[in-house]
Amino acid sequence: MHAERRSGPVELLGLDRPRLAAFFDTLGEKRFRARQIMQWLHQRHVYDFDEMTDLSKALRQRLREHARVGLPEVAADQQASDGTRKWVVRLADGNCVEAVYIPEPKRGTLCISSQAGCPMGCTFCATGEGGFSRNLTAAEIVGQVHVARQHLPEGAITNIVFMGMGEPLLNFDPVISASRVFTDDYGFVLSKRRVTISTSGVVHAIERMQRVTDVSLAVSLHAPNNELRNQLVPLNRKNPLERLLPACHAYIAEKPHRRITWEYVMLDGVNDQDEHARELLQRLRGIPSKVNLIPFNPYPGARYGRTPDRQVRRFADRLLEHGLTATIRETRGDDIDGACGQLVGEIRDARASKVARPA
């Protein structure tokens, strides 16, 4: 069994159903108890074992002795003028990560963090500027969703995206466990299409994803060639486009009507010209794709400028003219530093950002 803690009580919040069933095996209990606990935690929002009334008193006592359910603390709760909401979530060791809720007319998307800080060092992102502390546990990932649900109307969260702080695929097992909790019929009951893992391009882990999950995949592309992408996304030096694009194509090859979302932050005069659009079209030819163009969100000390809206529209039109689906992401939550690339949290014992070895 993969447990959240190596010693002491087992943290149940982040255990997917097979791991929760394995935990009950160690207690000599029937495996169906996993379904009961998941429903209490994720559907009824009950975290006190004494209130889980369909469990025997003896089992509740054993759970108190061998397990725990801990929610992270809300250090700050901010709401933007456009309705976007950001929670700064304090973890037990003092690290703070951020989760952002983005309401839209037909859906509500929660953007969650997978690491305290980020080791990737992307040159256009504030998160990487703060350094990297550690991976989050599955419980700390799932806990962000529980915190958000406590502050939102029932059913407000329809989509979950791993697009907050950190590189999800460098924290592979906890991220996959959390995603399984989100899609389980006894968990959050979200469609796998409504859970998205966003990566900067850890090829080995994308190939591993293909064997263990079929949630949606988004890739932070940001450049149509290796020379430019090496500058913007240092991971590209070991995971070049010649490896990344085939791995992504293979991930959706046996998934009908699925496509890869390519995230592309628009940097003034850097990656936003007509020749970049033409090159991008060539790169993505034959891969079912959607390109999400993201206006750059400046932050203190940023080395890049924001592409003018007119040029963003022109870039999108160039892609659309040649049959490639392209959307322009509306900037949300920038007045509370909750927009893409602005999440910084509060990182304890941070190490300088550097590209970690693929998981």
Curated annotation (Swiss-Prot):
InterPro entries: Aldolase_TIM, Methyltransferase_A, RlmN_N, RNA_MTrfase_RlmN, rRNA_lsu_MTrfase_RlmN/Cfr, rSAM. It catalyses: adenosine(2503) in 23S rRNA + 2 reduced [2Fe-2S]-[ferredoxin] + 2 S-adenosyl-L-methionine = 2-methyladenosine(2503) in 23S rRNA + 5'-deoxyadenosine + L-methionine + 2 oxidized [2Fe-2S]-[ferredoxin] + S-adenosyl-L-homocysteine; adenosine(37) in tRNA + 2 reduced [2Fe-2S]-[ferredoxin] + 2 S-adenosyl-L-methionine = 2-methyladenosine(37) in tRNA + 5'-deoxyadenosine + L-methionine + 2 oxidized [2Fe-2S]-[ferredoxin] + S-adenosyl-L-homocysteine. Keywords: 4Fe-4S, Cytoplasm, Disulfide bond, Iron, Iron-sulfur, Metal-binding, Methyltransferase, rRNA processing, S-adenosyl-L-methionine, Transferase, tRNA processing. The keyword rRNA processing applies. GO terms for molecular function: 4 iron, 4 sulfur cluster binding; metal ion binding; rRNA (adenine(2503)-C2-)-methyltransferase activity; rRNA binding; tRNA (adenine(37)-C2)-methyltransferase activity; tRNA binding. One of its GO terms (cellular component) is cytoplasm. Its main location: cytoplasm. Specifically methylates position 2 of adenine 2503 in 23S rRNA and position 2 of adenine 37 in tRNAs. m2A2503 modification seems to play a crucial role in the proofreading step occurring at the peptidyl transferase center and thus would serve to optimize ribosomal fidelity. Its cofactor is [4Fe-4S] cluster. This is Dual-specificity RNA methyltransferase RlmN. Binds 1 [4Fe-4S] cluster. The cluster is coordinated with 3 cysteines and an exchangeable S-adenosyl-L-methionine. [4Fe-4S] cluster binds at C118, C122, C125. It holds the Pfam family RlmN_N. The keyword tRNA processing applies. Its EC number is 2.1.1.192. It comes from Halorhodospira halophila (strain DSM 244 / SL1).
